[in-house]
Amino acid sequence: MTHRTSPSPVALTASVNGVPVDLAVASHETLLEVLRDRLGFTGTKKGCDQGACGACTVLVDGKRVLSCLTLAAQCDGREVTTIEGLASGDKLHPLQAAFVRHDALQCGYCTPGQIMSALALLAEGRAGSDDEIREFMSGNLCRCGAYPNIVAAIREIAE
């Protein structure tokens, strides 16, 4: 009988929402698992766990990534931003406030991923037309169907 041994932990030194983090992570541990289970950032949601719904979207060095498909070890030396890193105390980030004003959330489950993707869209200057916004945001699913309101919130900030 052959015994399998677990691979040695991998050192992870990163910044999460501007705070330095030093952890030993398993080589198979996803960024989503580390954020939610080890660091307590539960705003990042686990939806499909297959990269199809966008609920787990976070920013790594300003680029959107699906944290359920990203190994935590890949984030060594990088800046990770979650939905919790946007507000300043009780003051919402302007995009968060626009989502509220435009009623761009219903159940709210997809909202953190929607907002993180929208931030990347805006940073990349991809908010040309409403069709372009919808295309960029197509990787983020909303079961409640708040898509027109999501586009309106993004459009407000883009202008």
Can you annotate each of these PLM segments?
Residues 1-159:
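Signature of N-terminal electron-transfer/Fe-S-associated modules in redox systems
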